[in-house]
Amino acid sequence: MYNLADMKIYTHYTKITEKEGFRWRTLLHFGNSWDILGSVVMKNPGSAAVSCPVADAQVLQALRFFDGNKTREIWYEFTPDPTMYCVRDLFSEYHSIHTHEELNGVIQIFNLLYIRDAHLERALQKVAQLGSKDLTDYDVSHLVPPVYLGFSDLGKCATYQDTAQRFFHAALAQGMKCYNEDFFKNKFYHPLFLMRYARNTTYGLKARLQFIQNTTEPTTDG
């Protein structure tokens, strides 16, 4: 497993109030490479907090790639939250099977909405009050497989269903065969639930293996 220092979190952030803001284009960085290792789509940014603006010139140069070499937005380093560790662990399992190596590169995090709050209901209320950035076109066009869809039931509610389905169809087009082609037959387990609370359950193991083996009918052989 990794220590805190082995995972860096970089993101854009716009402060609204002392406790509220928009967080988007979040990257989990491991090792020395900046190659994209995959993408995850979730509900909304959680409890991870701003640490400081990124000042390292080499890091900033690497991050500009993720902005299409545009530098208008400030990059910040954030402290990780429990969900980020679960994303790390899920992709670590994936890459240990496919490459037999530790993570070395970037995992992209996308969301259905971008208000930062660990409590989804509060985040939804804030969206209603403050509005939110619509980054769906940008996000969908920047998905890189493997793509884990972990937005749970929020993706099936009326407000966010269209956005979730755009990510879903983009993932299918990118060759992700771990999802049922019928959108509504998928569970889309959130990584925190999958890797912590459901980790030792039969359905949790099946969901992990579906993603790792990229099939709806995984095997447990070997």
Regions inferred by a protein language model and the residue ranges of each:
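Active-site and ligand/interface coordination hotspots across diverse enzymes
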Residues: 1-75, 220-222
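Conserved acidic residues
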Residues: 37, 105, 144-148
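Residue-level detector of functionally special positions within alpha-helical transmembrane segments
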Residues: 42, 111, 190-193
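Catalytic metal-binding/acid-base residues of hydrolase active sites
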Residues: 44, 113, 154
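Surface-exposed cleft-lining segments at the edges of enzyme active sites
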Residues: 50, 67-80, 116-127, 154-155
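A short, N-terminal amphipathic alpha-helix
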Residues: 82-101
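Short connector loops at secondary-structure junctions
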Residues: 101-121
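Glycine/proline-rich loop-helix segments at beta-alpha junctions forming the active-site rim
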Residues: 116-222
